[in-house]
Each structure stands twice: as C-alpha cells, then as structure tokens.
C-alpha cells in the first residue's frame, strides 16, 4: 500500500450509478472533486462500476480508451417500437452489450410484463457477431420483459412454434402457446465465448424465479406472475428438448429469464460486479489503494448480499483496505465510513434536486473523516 507517512494516499473511487439521478461516471467525478478540496495531494483513480445492469458498457468504456462504439439503428425495442442499439468493441475483439440499453424498462411508455420482449438484444448480438466480434460480454439487468430470452433467441435464428407450426407472438405471454423450438438456423456463439453478467441468483421458475421475484417491478400483478411463471416452465421444457440447459441454475432468472435463454445458447452466467471490477482495473486496487470509495443510491441490508457495493466491501475487508460508502440514503451502517447525501442535504428531496453538488460535498466530508482517523 501507499504510505500515509508521506501525507498522500492512493484512493480508488469506484461507485455504482445513483439510479434516476447520476451515472457512475458522474458520481465518481463529483466525489473525486470534493475529496481533492480536502486532500489535494492524494492520487485519485476513478473507476466507475456496474453490475451488469444499467451503466455496464459505460463503466467498461471509461477504463478502455481504445474501445470503439458501434450503433445498430432500427432494432426492436421492448414494446416493439424501433430504437438504436449501442455496443462497445474492445481491442481484443470482445463486444460489450447492455440489455438495458435496447430492451430495458425505461424504454417502455407503460409496463407490459407479458408483452415486452428481448428481441432487440438478440438483434444487437447478431449485429456484433456479423461485425466480427470474437467474444461477447452481455450485461443482464434492467429488463422490461419476462420472456426467458426467447425474443433474443428468435433474433439469433431460433423459431418458436405453436402446435400448428406457426410462430408464437413476442413476449412472455406468447410462450404459453409454445409447442416446439427449431434451432436449426440458430447462429453459433463466438469462438471466444459468451459471458452473461448478472447480480442475481434467481432461478427461472417457481417462487424464487424470474416472474415472481422481478414481476412486481415490471408491473405484473399476482395473477400475471403466476401466468408468466407457467409460460416460462413451458419454454424451459421446449428449449430443454433441443439444447442443454438448466432452469435451476442460479442466475437463470436474470433479466426476466434471459439468463436461462442465453445460457442455453452457450453463455456462461458470471457475477457481474466481480467481472466489471476485473475489466475496469478495480480488482487490482484491493490491497494496492489505501482506501476505496464506493456508493449507490440506497445502501441497505440487501447491499451486502451480492450487490455491487457489497462486493466491493467484501474485497476491501479481505485485503484490509479502508472503505467509504456514499449513498443517497443510508438504511444500514456500512463497515467503514458511511455518508448519506440525504443527511447532508437535510432531506432526500434536497439531495435529489442537486445530486452532483451533494456528491462533491460528500467527497469532501469523506476525506475529512478519513483524515481524522489517521
């Protein structure tokens, strides 16, 4: 570690996004700006993070200056309207794709848990492969659909047929009519493999499955969740008859079951936060940096179980690295220094009105508190 005797420290600033207000890159910049007003001699390393959901591609792009952005106009959004898909091509030929960008819930005018699909994701994957991508890194999270990744597989060449041999409708509800799947024209995965980044251990079906765990946030009432769960079970049976797959694999329920569909295609489910930490260089900072500053919109008990901030804190503990957590709201006490923007601003409303400013204030407060412990 860098010696604190010299009066300066190495500080890794590695927050998640503050959903609905600031991107991870914006949070990192604001925290660093505030920190520098108190400890101007510290070496600040800005490493915005993500866990596979919103902000995944931007986090990787911020640490890979040689990455090249690609656009795929006219792909099918989750509700059928056209949108533009974006993906990042890294120097080694890996395509980084974020499901939330072209198949995410924010793209919906109104929730449609049974009708929304992942077709756009599949179209972007197909475009990346056609462009020569040698490997895929797909962030799963923030999806609008509960279609098991059926839409993505269809865009990759699979045919989902009812008992009369007709194509079924898009969306999770359409899976109820599924009788067979033709994978004869399914595009092969790239030679370098497919990594599926997820922050959940949800399985495909049942009380701990995609429909029941994530259905409520997509607007599905209890009856709809039951219906979608049965439809996903039908999909699993039909796909399992053609491809090796496991609906009970942890993470299969990610992104409305897209983890299941793309793992059947050949993808490998991996913990998103840990993989992004590796890709961005954060993993190398544990034990090297004197302190890691992380954060998210709300820090609570669930933050410590599989989420990005919990993963960062676990790595800090394992390497005896000091930690700071900055959150819009602290609903639980972090193991190191914890700072709430709502407390600093006097209310959640005030913090949300000027989040960047309060992140700068939090950065300064964090630096002062840390200095007082040295």
Where do the language-model regions lie?
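N-terminal loops that bind phosphate or other acidic moieties
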Residues: 2-140, 144-374
């Amino acid at each position: 570690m860098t010696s604190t005797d010299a009066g300066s420290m190495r500080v890794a600033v590695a927050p998640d996004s503050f959903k609905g207000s600031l991107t991870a890159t914006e949070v990192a910049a604001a925290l660093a700006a505030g920190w520098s007003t108190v400890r101007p001699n510290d070496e600040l390393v800005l490493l915005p993070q993500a866990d596979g959901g919103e902000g995944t591609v931007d986090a990787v792009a911020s640490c890979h200056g040689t990455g090249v952005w690609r656009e795929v106009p006219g792909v099918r959004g989750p509700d059928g309207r056209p949108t533009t898909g974006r993906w990042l091509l890294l120097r080694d030929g890996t395509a980084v794709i974020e499901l939330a960008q072209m198949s995410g819930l924010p793209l919906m005018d109104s929730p449609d848990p049974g009708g929304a699909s992942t077709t756009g994701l599949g179209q972007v994957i197909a475009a990346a492969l056609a462009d020569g991508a040698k490997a895929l890194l797909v962030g799963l999270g923030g999806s609008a659909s509960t279609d098991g990744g059926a839409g993505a597989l269809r865009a990759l060449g699979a045919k989902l047929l009812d008992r009369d041999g007709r194509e079924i409708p898009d969306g999770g509800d359409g899976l109820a009519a599924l009788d067979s799947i033709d994978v004869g024209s399914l595009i092969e995965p790239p030679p370098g493999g497919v990594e599926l980044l997820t922050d959940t251990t949800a399985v495909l079906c049942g009380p701990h499955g995609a429909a029941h765990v994530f259905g409520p946030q997509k607007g599905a009432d209890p009856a709809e969740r039951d219906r979608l769960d049965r439809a996903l079970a039908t999909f699993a049976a039909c796909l399992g008859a053609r491809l090796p797959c496991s609906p009970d694999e942890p993470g299969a329920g990610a992104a409305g079951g897209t983890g299941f569909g793309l793992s059947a295609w050949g993808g490998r489910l991996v913990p998103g936060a840990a993989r992004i930490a590796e890709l961005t260089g954060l993993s190398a900072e544990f034990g090297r940096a004197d302190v890691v500053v992380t954060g998210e919109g709300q820090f609570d008990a669930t933050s410590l179980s599989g989420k990005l901030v919990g993963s960062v804190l676990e790595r800090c503990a394992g390497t005896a690295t000091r930690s700071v957590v900055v959150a819009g709201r602290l609903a639980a006490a972090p193991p190191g220094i914890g700072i709430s923007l709502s407390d600093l601003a006097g209310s959640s409303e005030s913090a949300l009105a000027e989040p960047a400013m309060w992140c700068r204030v939090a950065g300064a407060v964090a630096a002062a508190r840390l200095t007082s412990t040295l």
